Amino acid sequence: MIQIIKKLRVLLDKKQKRTMVGLIILMVISAFLQTAGVGMLVEVMQIVIDPEAVQHSRVAEACYEIMGVESYRTFSIIVMVLLILVFVVKNLFTYVQQKLTLSFVYTNQFRTSERMMRNYLRRGYEFYLNADTAVVQRSITSDVNNMYALILALLQLLSDSVVSLFVISYCFISSGTMTILMAVVLLLLMWLIKRVLKPIMYKAGKDNQDYYSSLFKWISQTVQGIKEVKISGKEQYFVSEYRKCGKGYVDAVQRYSLYNQVPKLLIETACVATMVGYMIFLVATGVPTENMLTVFGTLAAAALVLLPCVNRINNQINSTAYFEPFFMGVSDNLQDEINGQNIDMSFATDEDEKLDVKESIEMKDITYAYPNTERLIFDHADLKIPVGASVGIVGTSGAGKSTVVDILLGLLEPSTGHIYADSVDVKEPGNYRKWLKNIGYIPQMIFMLDDTIRKNVAFGVPEDKIDEDRLWEVLKEAQLDEFIKTLPEGLETGIGERGIRLSGGQRQRIGIARALYNDPEVLILDEATSALDNDTEAAIMESINRLHGRKTLIIIAHRLQTIEKCDIVYRVEDGRAKIERGNL
């Protein structure tokens, strides 16, 4: 618990912490009002049963004299009306306090989820080479939701603890012995419950986290591979694997729900047994009945508030243990940010200028090996690309063709060497975004939004900022404009998830149009046509070759016909990039 509070103090910003302090103050006021309501209820019950009891209560007698009423009966009626008003005010205040608490929790829950998404997006490309997509999805959604469930449990725990403390203090004034006895029994029982159930709840929370990720993973894999799943007739296998994870997830949730009910049953049993045992003791020792009625009337009224509070306190302690793994996951993911490391959390904007390149792009002295591997993909390699030239890069599978592109794009960080645009280091502060602004990238598998053709070409551009004329210009360059004009909905045609309603060639042409939309000087094709048939590839390359001389073209290819019109061809092998054809 202490560790959670320490991390929470660092995780929340100043505004959030100030809001929490305000909520705690409201909780204390609410606790006082609840205790006052219990106290008034006991006093009113005594006055209604015996109006003469006013004389035995200094507070009641003082109120009676101030009001100046004619009889105790009239006074009791007025007091009952006041009791109703007190409970109305108390409950209205509690409603407002709960509303503010829930508003704080759920508003900041989404903000933290957005913060997590930003945190993941600013991570380097190398992180995603080994990342589990299901874990990333869970971290941004489920982990954050459960983290705020923990914060809500902590706030409610504090609120109920303050109420319990106030009510116990009131009971102590009425019957010190009984209150101490009850408090000792409850504290021992709560300590025992916490000691036994906390490890069980923590394990259930960890299992929930792991199995929830697996459920995400199997759903994602099933949908992404639906064609192969159906052709191979393996539907049952995927359902079975999903069921296995589901069984573990259900078991974890069941354990949490079941063991969360145990404290309530134990506490109610212990409280009733303690009170009845104390009554037996009083009867056996000959305590007058009227004294017993006063004491137990007070305790019974207090129990209406205290028992639910104590039950909730135990549930909240168990919930804290259950949600702790989720909270720690969020905290760990935001650790760099929390530690105040120099991290740029902002993103590229339309205002960013392009890094102009007039003469050449160079990779100098590049050494690179993928994480957790020893084999060097590049060993002090050099590569030069003249501006305006069409440059092909070939090599065997695994030689490092696509790695060249990833290093040029700044996605991979070499252990030695630099990337220069006209002698300007593109990774120097302030240069990298400008460098990317001047590059159009066409991969083998075009990433498609489940949206319209318009949104896929003007990728990531807000609707109100899309340049309609530019859209049609690049579609014409990609030789896709005539096809779109034949569609009933034109640019507003939905392409389906992963562009399933389009052919492979049409998807690639959308990729070309997208790469050209921002009018970059450099166009990179990373095996962009290798998955297409020969005729479609020839048509796509015709569109690309029309840009020869107007753009600097960097073409990664398997097939020689793809690069037959390139001015320079590099072959990547043995950790180097060697010119196979053409001259610099």
What are these regions (language model features)?
Residues L409:
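Helix-to-loop junction immediately C-terminal to a conserved catalytic motif
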